[in-house]
Curated annotation (Swiss-Prot):
Signal peptide region: 1-21
Stated family: Belongs to the OLFML3 family.
InterPro entries associated with the record: Olfac-like_dom, Olfactomedin-like_domain
Stated name of the protein: Olfactomedin-like protein 3
Cellular compartment(s): Secreted
Disulfide bridges in this chain: 135-328
């Protein structure tokens, strides 16, 4: 061993001494941490056991209550089924009584008409209408309905253009508004956030009531000019028809409707003064005047010029009427009660005189108790588009052939 060996030994001993002290402190620290973790674990186990015991007690208390609730639910379900069966039975009995004792339909064939040409712009009055198509159908019954959704307020109009794209939907909410919603297809209209999918078209003058019509790419509607019905002034008794081009968004024509002292044609729909309709024959208008405040009037319009071609005084009463539509030149008036009950077609008027009285049967709408703010017939689909207290409904119609009058 050389002279440097003792020095190396002393250096090694001096270096390992502090290392052993650090290891000792580290072991003590780990032991303290493990003891703390064991204590916290024991506390968690005690708390878990206590919560499990409380949960068992709560479950034992709830089980009898759940059994009682289940028994009550079954009892309520049984009572509901019983009430539903009784309601169905009552409706069948009412339907039977309605078929056994139907209200007499109001039908007029207009045989005694001798009226000549009317004043300029008013058209011929009470002359039989000459059909321009071979349409010869009448309503047999309102077969079924489908509730699409609820959109807008209690009164409004939704429809399709019978001469336009088959999928496009037009929605006009309210009785005094100037903005129409246009949906590219029915599926977009049924979405929860439907308004985001719609384009908006604003007309220059607000419409009146729910008598608007989309036909051949145009929006036809009645406008109240300053001083129109309800507004006072010189034009107190007049309304102006507007023809609005939906694509160009411009007014292409307008005309003062040639009837004085206008009043709402439907006793249950006070905001509508002129109800426009379209069928296989073209454009029609339903209205009423103070000259005969008990019955409806019908007019055939020229969709190009808005001229009135013919007018008729119908036997259909205004009282309890809520809406109407035209099919193959025949006016069908829908009646209801207040408060609302089951709507029914109780009066029809064939302008051409080909509908035999016995063929104009009373027809009830499917089982829904509501009030129709508007009805629009689509001749391409043979369906009615209805607005019922904010609900948009489609009615399918069953047709039958008209019988020629002998």
């Amino acid at each position: 061993m050389g002279p440097s060996a003792p020095l190396l030994l002393l250096f090694f001993l001096s270096w390992t001494g502090p290392l052993q002290g650090q290891q000792h402190h580290l072991v003590e620290y780990m032991e303290r941490r493990l003891a703390a973790l064991e204590e916290r674990l024991a506390q968690c186990q005690d708390q878990s056991s206590r919560l499990a015991a409380e949960l068992r007690d709560f479950k034992n208390k709830m089980l009898p209550l759940l059994e009682v609730a289940e028994k009550e639910r079954e009892t309520l379900r049984t009572e509901a089924d019983s009430i539903s069966g009784r309601v169905d039975r009552l409706e069948r009995e009412v339907d039977y009584l309605e078929t056994q004792n139907p209200a007499l339909p109001c039908v007029e064939l207009d045989e005694k008409v001798t009226g000549g040409p009317g004043a300029k712009g008013k058209g011929r009055r009470n002359e039989k209408y000459d059909m321009v198509t071979d349409c010869s159908y009448t309503v047999a019954q309102v077969r079924s309905m489908k509730i699409l959704k609820r959109f807008g307020g209690s009164a409004g109009l939704w429809t399709k253009d019978p001469l336009g794209p088959a999928e496009k939907i037009y929605v006009l909410d309210g009785t005094q508004n100037d903005t129409a919603f246009v949906f590219p297809r029915l599926r977009d209209f049924t979405l929860a956030m439907a308004a985001r999918k719609a384009s908006r078209i604003r007309v220059p003058f607000p419409w009146v009531g729910t008598g608007q019509l989309v036909y051949g790419g145009f929006l036809y509607y009645a406008r109240r000019p300053p001083g129109g019905p309800g507004g006072g002034g010189e034009l107190e008794n007049t309304l102006q028809l507007i023809k609005f081009h939906l694509a160009n968004r411009t007014v292409v024509d307008s005309s003062v409707f040639p009837a004085e002292s206008l009043i709402p044609p439907y006793g249950l729909t006070a905001d509508t003064y002129i109800d426009l309709a379209a069928d296989e024959e073209g454009l029609w208008a339903v209205y009423a005047t103070r000259d005969d405040d008990r019955h409806l009037c019908l007019a055939k319009l020229d969709p190009q010029t808005l001229d009135t071609e013919q007018q008729w005084d119908t036997p259909c009463p205004r009282e309890n009427a809520e809406a109407a539509f035209v099919i193959c030149g025949t006016l069908y008036v829908v009646y209801n009660t207040r408060p609302a009950s089951r709507a029914r077609i109780q009066c029809s008027f064939d302008a051409s005189g080909t509908l035999a009285p016995e063929r104009a049967a009373l027809s009830y709408f499917p089982r829904r108790y509501g009030a129709h703010a508007s009805l629009r017939y689509n001749p391409r689909e043979r369906q009615l588009y209805a607005w019922d207290d904010g609900y948009q409904i489609v009615y399918k119609l069953e047709m039958k052939k008209k019988e020629e009058e002998v």
